[in-house]
A protein has these predicted regions:
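Short C-terminal tail/terminal secondary-structure segment
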Residues: 1-4, 151, 230, 241-254
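Active-site helix of classical SDR
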Residues: 126, 162, 170
């Protein structure tokens, strides 16, 4: 039956940035589909753990500050997932930050912080997970891109650079790892009602201009990403490699 292809029973997923918002929603979605969940964040993942446990799935919190994490730290996180939960089948690289300033005034510190979390840590976590997935002959990696993987944006040069990089690395890794049984794809969320967009939503003029361009007529929510995440994490997407799927209420069609 086709619906069985979307089940994740017996699978284990590692989700970064799972404390709240999109990451919490993604972790919950995979648990609802049957997966055990490891949540990597700086802390405070008890609420996410409660949602996972409510689905009668196992939950493993992993404390890690991606602003400072080295490739060795990320390799250790993957090894802990395998040691404590038995395997790693799915990685969702959701953790990310944004800094806003005009390009002429943008600081090196803000540039480096964004690039380290959004791009460098993402790549080396892909690498660490793929080493394990290649050995077992299968795996699903889902990177969280952005509309700014396709567009330039305003006042967010490092974020745009990092998310353009996420899309590029997703395609590059798909080229290398498809033959190893690893699917690497990405989801590009639109304007979501999360902490990253709080400043935009608090600006009445900017918020109205954004909503006027979205055919769906509303801000997105973590619930809107669940279907795409489960699809990409499941065997239903076995022939999909290197895709960057917009979930944006139609923003990119305008």
């Amino acid at each position: 039956m086709i619906l069985d292809a979307f089940r994740l029973d017996g699978k284990t997923a590692l989700v970064t940035g799972a404390r709240q918002g999109l990451g919490q929603g993604l972790a919950s979605a995979l648990a609802e589909a049957g997966a055990d969940i490891a949540a990597l964040d700086i802390g405070g993942v008890a609420e996410t753990g409660g949602a996972v446990n409510a689905c009668r799935r196992r939950f493993l919190p992993i404390a890690c500050d991606l602003r400072k994490a080295s490739p060795a730290d990320l390799q250790a996180a993957v090894e802990r997932v395998v040691s404590e939960l038995g395997r790693l089948d799915i990685l969702i690289n959701n953790a990310g930050i944004i800094r806003r300033a005009p390009a002429l005034e943008f600081s090196e510190t803000d540039w480096d912080d964004v690039m380290h979390i959004n791009l460098k840590a993402m790549f080396f976590l892909c690498q660490a997970a793929a080493r394990n997935m290649a050995a077992q002959g299968s795996g699903k990696i889902i990177n969280i891109a952005s509309m700014l993987s396709f567009q330039g944006g305003i006042l967010v040069p490092s974020y745009t650079a990092s998310k353009s990089g996420v899309a590029g690395i997703t395609r590059a890794l798909a080229n290398e790892w498809a033959s190893k049984g690893i699917n690497v794809n990405a989801i590009a969320p639109g304007y979501m009602a999360t902490d990253n967009t709080a400043a935009l939503r608090a600006d009445p003029r900017r918020s109205v201009s954004i909503l006027e361009r979205i055919p769906a007529g509303r801000w997105g929510s973590p619930e809107d990403l669940k279907g795409a995440a489960v699809f990409l994490a499941s065997s239903a997407s076995d022939y999909l490699h290197g895709a960057v799927i917009p979930v944006d209420g139609g923003w990119l069609t305008r």
